[in-house]
């Protein structure tokens, strides 16, 4: 069986175009995680707060970030896909975040194969309402989990997202190549 984290490339033209492996689905409370040892997607938990993922959420293959996990990516989609789905996407922004004292930033991306997102090239192209909903979700989704503390730290542009992806690719190479 293919290991979606280790066996797939980061993207067809990373960091400009990446692959996003979906774990969690838009509109749902289930927190799935890819378990590379199985390999497969497993239910990690159901979110304790009454919130749902604002869009499909997962990771970028062959990346490793400062939180010692594959680099997180939220892909703006109209309709949810499914856990394990691979979306070819373009990074357009970076959300800075601290999760229990660890840097846990999120790449925001759009699907290459959805013309509804062709006009979104950078942070300034994302509607403010969408950014507010994403920020609200990540700022509050762990509120009812004992001992968990999350702080969103603002937004950065496409270049910052691409730089962070390159950093995560380098960390993967240093730790796993």
Curated annotation (Swiss-Prot):
Highest taxon in the source lineage: Archaea
Protein location: Cytoplasm
Pfam families cross-referenced by the UniProt entry: Pyrophosphatase
The EC number(s) this enzyme carries: 3.6.1.1
Note: A unique feature of H.volcanii PPA (HvPPA) is its high tolerance to organic solvents, with little if any enzyme inactivation after 2 hours of incubation in buffers supplemented with 50% (vol/vol) dimethyl sulfoxide (DMSO), dimethylformamide (DMF), ethanol, or methanol. The catalytic activity of HvPPA is also found to be robust when assayed in organic solvents. Moreover, HvPPA is fully active over a wide range of salt concentrations.
Assembly: Homohexamer. Also forms homotrimers, but the trimeric form is 23% less active than the hexamer. In fact, likely forms a dimer of trimers.
Protein name stated in the entry: Inorganic pyrophosphatase
Name of the encoding gene: ipp
């Amino acid at each position: 069986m293919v290991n979606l984290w280790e066996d797939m490339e980061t993207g067809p033209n990373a960091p400009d175009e990446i692959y996003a492996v979906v774990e969690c689905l838009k509109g749902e409370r289930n927190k799935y995680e890819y378990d590379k040892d199985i390999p497969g997607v497993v239910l990690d938990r159901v979110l304790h707060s009454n919130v749902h993922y604002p869009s499909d959420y997962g990771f970028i293959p062959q990346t490793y970030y400062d939180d010692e996990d594959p680099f997180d990516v939220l892909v703006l989609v109209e309709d949810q896909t499914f856990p394990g789905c691979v979306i070819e996407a373009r990074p357009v922004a970076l959300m800075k975040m601290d999760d229990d004292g660890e840097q846990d930033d999120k790449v925001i991306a759009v699907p290459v194969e959805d013309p509804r997102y062709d006009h979104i090239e950078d942070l300034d192209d994302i509607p403010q309402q969408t950014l507010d909903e994403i920020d609200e979700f990540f700022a509050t989704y762990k509120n009812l989990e004992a001992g968990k503390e999350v702080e969103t730290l603002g937004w950065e542009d496409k270049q910052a997202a691409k730089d962070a992806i390159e950093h995560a690719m380098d960390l993967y190479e240093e730790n796993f190549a």
